[in-house]
Swiss-Prot record:
Matches recorded under Pfam families: F-box, LRR_6
Biological source species: Arabidopsis thaliana (Mouse-ear cress)
GO BP, one annotated term: heat acclimation
Gene3D superfamilies found in the cross-reference section: Ribonuclease Inhibitor (3.80.10.10)
Function: Component of SCF(SKP2B) E3 ubiquitin ligase complexes, which mediate the ubiquitination and subsequent proteasomal degradation of the cyclin-dependent kinase inhibitor KRP1. Does not interact with auxin.
Domain of life: Eukaryota
The F-box domain, residue ranges: 25-76
Key words, A-Z: Leucine-rich repeat, Repeat
InterPro entries: F-box-like_dom_sf (IPR036047), F-box_dom (IPR001810), Leu-rich_rpt (IPR001611), Leu-rich_rpt_Cys-con_subtyp (IPR006553), LRR_dom_sf (IPR032675)
Protein name (record): F-box protein SKP2B
């Protein structure tokens, strides 16, 4: 995103060029489209919508030039607003419709699908009123989606979600947190079969999925980097073993309250790190070391784990931290894991030994 300071410099340059070219602005409609869009980049989305109503010239300029819009500020009548705006803003690539209270209905999502065919990033979180009809509409009209947030959407089925994946095959980021009824093993099988570019998936609180679903996901989405299985209470070590073996680029794994997880899962993660060290060395040569290896792991409330198994993971992946301010290895509720420590503690101990405090 271009900074506000850089945009202001561009505006000043535009004004200077207009002076040199003798451009006269006597009415609002005379403002050049390029200048108008630079001005609108400095204001909030509500003002952009108002600007599109000033005159037909501004409406057309905004319609063709606006690629990102958020209506999250709209606390009521969002559905009507979307119905009004969707036919006008046909070049949108990012649309944020996050709600505090559910407002959106199927007809608004259908309008988006009918008009916004270039959409790549869509946030429909907490749209608990939308049903299967919305997902079928998106599958028909928004096949370029790479990022989709459906968290908190509780009124559609796994059949509709599976159908969506067959048409939105470019998805890289998918948030299904809390979509309890829609996320089943069949859903994960469909995602694995159709969305092999997927890199981030949130399945938090989707308590109906089992190892079968996660294994299908692991085999079908080898580029997976972030996976949240928070409170997926049915999964066992088999899921983690499959992820460790198949998803070698995994960076973040959430296993909060997955109480069937044991040491076997931890050792499989550690072994995958050792086995894939050649990938890490390849990244080092490219100057991308920070991008390789597990960097975030949440095993809170996984009470079957022992210190030795978790320490093996921590030793294998030095980006996992237990030290203050850098908690990327989260172990809340696991009192028996208090002895697990990251490399920073050993380094601090060595420093203290080499440079002891002077006597007073």
């Amino acid at each position: 995103m271009v900074s506000e300071g850089a945009t202001r410099k561009e505006l000043n340059l535009c004004f200077e060029n207009m002076k040199m070219e003798g451009v006269l602005i006597s009415e609002w409609k005379d403002i050049p489209v390029e200048l108008l869009m630079k001005i609108l980049n400095l204001v909030d989305d509500r003002t952009v919508i108002i600007a599109s109503c000033i005159c037909s010239g501004w409406r057309d300029a905004v319609s063709l030039g606006l690629t990102r819009l958020s209506l999250s500020w709209c606390k009521k009548n969002m559905n009507s607003l979307v119905l009004s705006l969707a036919p006008k803003f046909v070049k949108l690539q990012t649309l944020v419709l996050r709600q505090d209270k559910p407002q959106l209905e199927d007809n608004a999502v259908e309008a988006i699908a009918n008009h916004c065919h270039e959409l790549q990033d869509l946030d429909l979180s907490k749209s608990s009123k939308i049903t299967d009809h919305s997902l079928y509409s998106l599958a028909r009209g928004c096949t370029n989606l790479t990022k989709l947030n459906l968290s908190g959407c509780t009124s559609f089925s796994d059949t509709a979600l599976a159908h969506l994946t067959r048409f939105c095959r470019k998805l890289k980021i998918l948030n299904l947190c809390g979509c309890v009824e829609a996320v089943s093993d069949n859903t994960l099988q469909a995602i694995g079969e159709n969305c092999n570019q997927l890199q981030s998936l949130n399945l938090g609180w989707c308590e109906n999925i089992s190892d079968d679903g996660v294994m299908s996901l692991a085999y079908g989405c080898p580029d997976l980097r972030t996976l949240d299985l928070c409170s997926c209470v049915l999964i066992t070590d088999e899921s983690v073993v499959a992820l460790a073996n198949r998803c070698i680029h995994l960076r973040s794994l959430g296993l909060y309250y997955c109480r069937n997880i044991t040491d076997r899962a931890m050792y499989s993660l550690a072994q995958s790190g050792v086995k894939n060290k050649h990938e890490m060395w390849r990244a080092v040569k490219k100057g991308k070391f920070d991008e390789e290896g597990l960097r975030s792991l949440n095993i809170s409330q996984c009470t079957y784990l022992t210190p030795s198994a978790v320490q093996a993971v921590c030793d294998t992946f030095p980006a996992l931290h237990t030290c203050s301010g850098r908690h990327s290895l989260v172990m809340s509720g696991c009192l028996n894991l208090q002895s697990v420590h990251c490399a920073c503690i050993l380094q601090a101990h060595r420093t203290h030994t080499v440079y002891p405090h002077p006597a007073h």
